[in-house]
Amino acid sequence: SSAAHHYGSPRVLCESFGGIYWNANFARMKWLTDWEYVLGIDLLNPHGFHYSIEGDRKRDWPPSQFYHHPFWKYYRRFAEYVSRLSYMLSGGKHVANVLFLFPIISAWANYIPQKRTTLFDIIERDFYYLTDMLLRIHWDYDYVDENILRDAEIIGDKIKIKEEFYDVLLLPPITTIKTSTMEKIKNFYNSGGKILAGILLPFQSAEKGYDEEVIKNFRDLFGVDPLEVSSEIIKCISMKRKRYAIKAIKRKNKRGGCAYFIKATAPLSAIKPSKLIDKLLSEMSKADVKIDDPEILCLHKVKDGVDIFFIVNPSEVTRNFTLSLRSRGKPEIWDPENGSVETLWIYQIENNGVKIPLTLHGYGSKFIVLKANEEEPHITDTNIKVERVEKDGDKIRIIAYAERACNAYIEISWKNLKEKLFLGMLEGPKIIELPTKWKFKIIGENAFLIDFWKVKMDDEEERGFKEGWYKPEYDESGWLSLNCGPLSAYFSEAPRALWYKSRFNVEGGKVRKILLDGVEGDAFRLFINGEEINVRGPSSILDVNITEVDISDKVRLGENVIAILIKPSSLKDGLLDPIRILGEFKVTEKECKISLDPLHNEIVVGKSWTEQGFPYYSGTIIYETEIEIPNLTSDKKVLLDCGDVRDILEVVVNDESCGIRLWQPYIIDVTRNLKSGRNKIELKVTNTAANIIKGEKVPSGLLSPPKLIMYDLHEISLGYNDFKGMTNHND
């Protein structure tokens, strides 16, 4: 994105999701997307959409984003989320205070292929540290290479590149610099510019190597000798000191220019002086954004005259924090998940800026948009949750609820007046635990994967037929044991023919078909219980090129035998993928023995599908239950909290859809859908493709018991005349 800013590119594209494998879900894809967009990407190119994943294609930088994945039916919602990000963040002007010199010349100057050098390690590790740390202390920046910096304009005490203006030039530890870069740095300082450097200063030029002029210029600029600080840091590192010393050496000129150098006895990556760097930057420039949580990331853009802040929580836990903005206006929260726009009612106006308390769930993201509207009544402080605020002339009506029992208060500001209202003790929510056993429906068919085989070479090709190797009564226990995969993993040369044989038990249910996938060779034949099966069949729902073969009339109760004869042409051939058996059954493991058993009509919430007979199922299971809710009144707010869901949740109450959650939090407002009396609840849960495609027993389903959380809504109404004046009121 820095290059796009400096070369004038209107869009920044990034190909994403290749290599995140078949257990990828929307939560992980959202995390990656948010990370990219908060760093300046505004056009997503998802990888990839395979027409077919049959055979080795499923291993070519997976996953497919296409119909093979159970989440495909919800993909439009994810695409709409990304579209909203792109719409909000495309175009406009990026706001950053810091210009960060990219230290590639110094890295090459100190790089030795045969070994790592001390100076190269400092340059590399401190570059990575500064890159991450600046994001965490919320000083946004652009990288700049020396050619771009050479051509940049100096306007007053700022550096201008295309449409970007920068207050501070940051020099990471460097040893080597172009002469033109050195001249630009001097001119910037002499024009009142601010420069922050650390640990190392240049003593070489790219043109000459060791360069006395470079040493003199940087010694005059920062008041320290570049050769001395280089020798000292190398000596300190070699002594392996456990205690570090660090200080800032500050130089200023009459035009307001600042040249600050951080001198230390260890690299920045070892000391991690984020507070010191934040303090020094704050002396040089006014922070555009301050957030009291280093885990929260922020991108600021100005578009159509409006300040837009993209706020991201890349951690998995809910975070409460305060967002302090130098800009001023009426804040709105724009939700890219559903496209809603709501006024933010809780904030403070301080020092001509805005302070906003916010909460973001794990992997959450929101836009804060500042609108230049007239002063509105707003809440400056409260310990209860504000549901909504309605304004009618000189009157406001606040609807709120207590998330826990408390002595409630709410402080309201309107123009130059403020009023703090004490509401007394409010009760917390009522929790309604839902049943642990639910009825269920499985969409499609359950799966059982056979990945363990007994294998024997048949160099005569016909010997296996003559001796009946494919028959149930033939004992294959002495054969070679192996898993699916190319023959190169087990053989030095391809045999003329190879028999695969495996056994499985059926105790009930209905076995309907098998899927033939990754059976590679010049020819192959399939046998079930000694009877050859016609391998021609229709395309399966899993993939257009994976054949579906009906075996419903070949399978019997008790032990069943499957045998496959493959004639490979090379070591790349063989049985590359598990054989997938589909039908209406559950997979049961008892005393290390696996059987296919009859389905029951109940499923337990709080336990994975993999523990309840569906270890290889990928798709959707519908949980169904009914609950009684007496005397449900209009002054209630009811949330359905499903806790830990893997991976997509769709909620239907009384036959009406209430919402879909592609990622956490799996909480949905069901207030309008519930009624007094009997209520029917359906939870449609969809997992990933890893279970059926890779045979991975990825936890799926409702992994914690759902519950209803019922809050009492309270109404606070007051007019402008109810306020009391306060002198010198900042807010």
Set out the residue ranges of the language-model regions:
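Carbohydrate-binding surfaces of carbohydrate-active enzymes
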Residues: 1-473, 477-481, 487-513, 531-541, ...
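Short, solvent-exposed loop/turn segments in extracellular or other extracytoplasmic domains
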Residues: 349-353, 542-548, 661-668
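Aromatic-lined ligand-binding clefts that engage carbohydrates, nucleic acids, or primary amines
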Residues: 479, 496, 504-530, 562-564, ...
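Long, low-complexity serine/threonine/glycine- and acidic-rich segments characteristic of extracellular
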Residues: 533-539, 656-663
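Signal that preferentially marks extracellular ectodomain short beta-strand elements
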Residues: 548-554, 668-671, 694
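Glycine-centered tight-turn motifs at strand-turn-strand junctions
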Residues: 558, 670-677
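Exposed low-complexity, polar/acidic, P/S/T/G-rich flexible segments that act as propeptides
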Residues: 571-595, 693-731
